[in-house]
């Protein structure tokens, strides 16, 4: 993924802001995360790509990025974290290790969903002031060759909140607007400051849903925080996220044809987890 961006940059391809993206290769994922942190602090919209052990090396900087309300997106092709042996295939053991960093987590199940919903992560990060892990299954999704409908840059530009972009840049380190960062706090005030960010996470599901609705309007899709597939009065429901959802949907079609009442709740926004949205979808279709 990063290699494609590098090729586009070398070819002079412009982004929605009319700029050629600068690509920097660091010595390791730890260095990449530090560079992302510094770049964001200087007011540059920044993203990175990683997976598995590489993502784990980024965790210390992820805590800082999230706590400083720096809107970025880490695109992660989720892969197994190697233990007694190397395993390069897709599970979620890497992204699950990042649940408490403060990053929001958005998941896609196939190549078309990655194309459609990746902008939602970027747009919601800017408006919501919360960084995102945008993840999909390694190899099963990240290396699948598939024909997809791609975004028109003008459509993306229309959805981008330029006021949020300006606010982010004004928040950057600048000698004309001196501010203190990286201070030391004792326990009496540290906890209060840490909890002060809760309101952003409480508001974030609505922000994500807003941009999903904008995507739906432009593409004719039906993306929600949680999507349901199956019988309207299901007696058995599977809750899943990632590429397995496509397989489950085919299985549900087969079982519905046999008269079985089954369904699937597809999780898209995993963090922050909206209990209200989850309960609304589940109880609408699940027969007690």
Where in this protein do the model-derived segments appear?
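A general structural motif
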Residues: 85-88, 207-223, 240-248, 267-274
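Short, solvent-exposed amphipathic alpha-helical segments in soluble enzyme
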Residues: 4-8, 63-65, 122-124, 149-152, ...
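Glycine-rich beta-alpha junction loops
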Residues: 79-80, 136-143, 242-244
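Conserved small/polar residues in nucleotide/adenosyl-binding loops
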Residues: 284-285
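Redox- and metal-dependent alpha/beta enzyme cores, enriched for Fe-S-associated oxidoreductases
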Residues: 232-260, 273-278
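Conformationally flexible catalytic loops at phosphate/diphosphate-handling active centers
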Residues: 17, 132-227
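Conserved thiamine diphosphate
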Residues: 88-138, 162
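Thiamine diphosphate
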Residues: 1-97, 102, 119, 139
